[in-house]
């Protein structure tokens, strides 16, 4: 926004773990999204001309927008392997009051930003919206991956932090599971991974911020546990191999066209309880394993495949490094029309 000379009065409510360079963004007022600031959040939701959200916010259910106000859902991922919204399997277990609130929140999304036609179809089913709600301008969060000099800088920076030297970096970033709020259990056999790969690789572990586990016990010469609050976009340039399961990370990492493996040890259970997208096994751009032994063998025998490039092209169709610019142009137009 600032680069384009567009600096309207902007209020940003954020999770307290996120830090910003407030000096560079002097036109933005940053407020932690906590109980103490809840009344301010409600005030600005009711008085702003343009509202950007990136997740489900129950507060929207209590807001009645005036004519001309537009709430735009940016979402926090440019693709989805697990179901959400009305597609989430757990919806059937929620109360009538919950479902009424979900409906009220989703109806406030006048536009939803998408990076692909595939994700647009998922949003239509998940939020019960139609084609006119879709803003096909690309996903702003992917713009950084098209800045080659920045990505090269990040790769060098993080490899130095990892003391990678001549070793390659494997990132294991499992998705969040609802039962991990109390205590998480990592199924991967880290000893077996170390025996198999310690000569040529480092294993970087990146867990969801909500996961509770004694990570200090996992730090070895082979395993590096990254702080939960480190943003993934900071890390991906330094990664040579990604291991995940049902998270949205592959949709961004595919832009690098580097190998992705899916350690989906609880696939049937997860699909039953939470729900995976249809044809999950056909859509993902890499092999599935359900045991560490299978995973090790797959990594050892990996081959170059065109699947990754095709996957990235399909799911990042509208994301070309200029999505943020198009978003700013769109917001500027909305603000001018609202005068």
Predicted regions and their residues:
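C-terminal amphipathic helix plus adjacent low-complexity
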Residues: 150, 292-339
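Catalytic binding pocket for nucleotide-activated donors in carbohydrate/polymer assembly enzymes
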Residues: 218, 248-315
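Active-site and donor-binding regions of nucleotide-sugar-utilizing enzymes
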Residues: 1-149
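Conserved catalytic-core segment of nucleotide-activated headgroup transferases in glycan assembly
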Residues: 1-5, 126, 134-217, 289, ...
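Tryptophan-centric aromatic hotspots in well-structured domains and transmembrane helices
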Residues: 10-13, 71-75, 172, 176, ...
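Short, charged/polar "capping" segments at the starts of alpha-helices
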Residues: 16-23, 120-122, 180, 210-216, ...
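Donor nucleotide-activated moiety binding/catalytic core segment of transferases
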Residues: 32-48, 209-251
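A donor-sugar binding/catalytic signature common to diverse glycosyltransferases
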Residues: 51-65, 70-75, 229-274
């Amino acid at each position: 926004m600032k680069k384009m000379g567009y600096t309207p009065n902007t209020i940003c409510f954020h999770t307290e773990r996120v830090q910003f360079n407030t000096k560079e963004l002097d036109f933005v007022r940053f407020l932690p999204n906590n109980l103490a600031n809840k009344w301010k959040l409600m005030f600005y939701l009711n008085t702003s001309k343009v509202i950007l959200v990136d997740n489900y916010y129950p507060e929207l259910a209590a807001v009645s927008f005036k004519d001309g106000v537009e709430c735009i859902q940016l979402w926090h991922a440019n693709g989805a392997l697990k179901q959400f919204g009305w597609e989430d399997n757990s919806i059937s277990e929620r109360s009538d009051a919950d479902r009424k609130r979900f409906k009220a929140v989703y109806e406030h999304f006048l536009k939803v930003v998408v990076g692909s036609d595939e994700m647009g179809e998922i949003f239509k089913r998940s939020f019960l919206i139609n084609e006119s709600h879709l803003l096909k301008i690309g996903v702003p969060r992917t713009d950084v991956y098209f800045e080659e000099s920045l990505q090269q800088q990040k790769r060098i920076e993080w490899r130095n932090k990892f003391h990678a030297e001549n070793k390659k970096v494997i990132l294991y970033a499992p998705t969040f599971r609802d039962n991990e709020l109390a205590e998480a259990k990592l199924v991967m056999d880290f000893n077996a991974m170390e025996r198999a790969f310690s000569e040529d690789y480092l294993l970087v572990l990146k867990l969801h911020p909500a996961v509770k586990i004694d990570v200090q016990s996992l730090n070895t010469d082979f395993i590096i546990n990254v702080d939960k609050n480190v943003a993934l976009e900071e890390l991906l340039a330094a990664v040579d191999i990604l291991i995940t399961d049902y998270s949205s990370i592959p949709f961004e990492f595919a832009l690098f066209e580097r190998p992705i493996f899916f350690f989906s040890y609880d696939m049937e259970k997860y699909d039953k309880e939470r729900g995976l997208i249809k044809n999950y096994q056909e859509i993902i751009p890499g092999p599935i394993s359900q045991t560490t032994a299978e995973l090790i063998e797959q990594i050892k025998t990996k081959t170059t495949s065109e699947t990754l490039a095709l996957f990235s092209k399909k799911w990042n169709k509208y994301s070309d490094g200029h999505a943020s610019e198009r978003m700013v142009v769109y917001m500027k137009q909305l603000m001018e029309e609202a005068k």
